[in-house]
Amino acid sequence: MSGRFAVILAAGQGTRMKSKLYKVLHPVCGKPMVEHVVDQVSKLEFDKTAVIVGHGAEEVKKTLTEKIEFVMQPEQLGTGHAVKCAEHLLASQKGTTVVLCGDTPLITAATIKKLMDTHEANGAKATVLTAHAPDPTGYGRVIRGNQGQVEKIVEHKDASVDELAIAEVNTGTYCFDNEALFEALAEVKNENAQGEYYLPDVIGILRQKGETISAYQTDSLSETMGVNDRVALSQAEAAMRKRINEEWMRQGVTIIDPQTTYISADASIGQDTVLYPNTSIKGPSVIGEDCVIESGTEIASATLGRGVHVCSSVISNSVVADGSSIGPFAHIRPGSDVGENVRVGNFVELKKASIGTGSKVSHLTYVGDAEVGSDVNVGCGVVTVNYDGKNKHKTIIKDGAFVGSGSNLIAPVEIGERAFVAAGSTITDDVPSQALSIARSRQVNKDNYVKKDV
């Protein structure tokens, strides 16, 4: 019985990135490059997926949680050597093997499937994913025979002047008959400018044996882009951002200026939501339908319900329920839970705070480590004083309470249901339900305190 296998090459050090971070772990739209590739592969029915790792292997293993197998390439001796490291997993298997690069984050499942379909339809032993490159510098060239058949692939550094003029390039993605692949790998030599074992040499070896070699030429060179330095990383980021934004617009999201709008690969956005220019949706954020996200807003790994309005604010690792309004210039820090129809206004900071339905925290307020009930009014300049220099303490404000402007609530403290705190109070003890608490000195006016002749 024939199987389908995938090998993802992710062992390169990536010295041109000039980074301490392992190359394939550099993010594109918030997700590591290699994870983009694995996600696309996982959409197809492969019996086994192997990721070849070397430098930073443990970090790659931590990043990828799919059911895949990791193969160590102890020395980076070329792409042919990398695939050969998976011999113990695949060599005895009948079927088709797709080889992809872990630094090609734009590759899609649709293109991989077309490559495999072409391979199987032609009864080929190897099929190369190729593309037309206006500037083929750095790419391996696809050399074809008189009948248009693929004869071999020549790396840029080893190409002749005539071969360098060829614009059809090897993208680094292949489909092989699995048994033929590993038989040919045993014959690959490292007699080249780099002294490495090149996977493309398998094409020439199979062709010399009279085997059928085919090619599938994609019309999207950008999809096959390999990322080797920060310039290419920025180009991949721009292409992925464009793809993501256009997909959300097709699904009913209004993006006023796609060029200045960032949406992570893991985000989800509901229909009829409007994103203004200079907005950033990071991580696995979920934004409901009919929301308005105005300029200058950053939403990071947060969940927004339906009809939420956010203006020039930051919301991180928190939940905002239906119909609530945030900002301008509010900061919703991790662990906060904002209920339905809540108003969190300008220059308000929440941290590990829950705000009940219909409550208002409108101006210049800090609410941290707090539980605020429903229909509560928190006045301007209120501070929950939660830190004693060593430990954090909780403030509880129950349903219907009113906290006057300029009040300090010294935690741990509880404000009872429908209780009132007078403006300017410093509350150190619990306030009973329906009570009025005034915790400030009486006003004393000193007549003639300032002499008239001063």
Swiss-Prot record:
Q: Where does Mg(2+) bind?
A: D103, N228
Cite the residue spans of the region called Pyrophosphorylase: 1-230
Chain residues that bind acetyl-CoA: N386, Y387, S405, A423, R440
Instruction: Tell me which domain of life the UniProt entry assigns to the organism this sequence originates from.
Output: Bacteria
Molecular functions (GO terms): glucosamine-1-phosphate N-acetyltransferase activity; magnesium ion binding; UDP-N-acetylglucosamine diphosphorylase activity
Q: How is the cofactor bound?
A: Binds 1 Mg(2+) ion per subunit.
GO cellular component labels: cytoplasm; membrane
Q: What is its EC number?
A: 2.7.7.23, 2.3.1.157
The active site lies at: H363 (proton acceptor)
Which family is it part of? In the N-terminal section; belongs to the N-acetylglucosamine-1-phosphate uridyltransferase family. In the C-terminal section; belongs to the transferase hexapeptide repeat family.
Physiological role: Catalyzes the last two sequential reactions in the de novo biosynthetic pathway for UDP-N-acetylglucosamine (UDP-GlcNAc). The C-terminal domain catalyzes the transfer of acetyl group from acetyl coenzyme A to glucosamine-1-phosphate (GlcN-1-P) to produce N-acetylglucosamine-1-phosphate (GlcNAc-1-P), which is converted into UDP-GlcNAc by the transfer of uridine 5-monophosphate (from uridine 5-triphosphate), a reaction catalyzed by the N-terminal domain.
Describe the protein's quaternary organization and the partners it interacts with.
Homotrimer.
Q: What is the protein name stated in its UniProt record?
A: Bifunctional protein GlmU
- In which organism is this protein found? Shouchella clausii (strain KSM-K16) (Alkalihalobacillus clausii)
Q: Which gene encodes it?
A: glmU
